[in-house]
């Protein structure tokens, strides 16, 4: 069973997936910082200087806090500002992944086109096969007895 597990892990697809997950996690942090630290402040400035992450609707009359964290401590809230921030994170990440996949597909198509244009050159046959081919050709040219 251990050998099967080693073979499973050593396969290329599993290793590629592991690398993709690790890079994706790190890249997700970059996109989150991009949205939280660069995009959302600009959007907030355009729409009145507010921080979208603190936009919420109280779902009970007991909630009267100015920030989302304090409001959550007081009761149930509908935190649509946090949702908008996460949605923008997702859309940016999905767009970047789409562009990366599109670029990889384009490169694959270019390689496939090149392979179709260049016929595959077979290596020359071994010397003994060449000799046998020459003998066959000479025998074929001899008149029948």
UniProtKB/Swiss-Prot annotation:
Ranges that cross the membrane: 14-34, 38-58, 81-101
PROSITE patterns the record matches: MSCL
Localization per Swiss-Prot or TrEMBL: Cell inner membrane
Keyword check for Ion transport: yes
Keywords: Cell inner membrane, Cell membrane, Ion channel, Ion transport, Membrane, Transmembrane, Transmembrane helix, Transport
Pfam families reported in the protein's UniProt record: MscL (PF01741)
Protein family according to the UniProt entry: Belongs to the MscL family.
Subunit structure: Homopentamer.
Record protein name field: Large-conductance mechanosensitive channel
Organismal lineage: Bacteria, Pseudomonadati, Pseudomonadota, Alphaproteobacteria, Hyphomicrobiales
Gene that encodes the chain: mscL
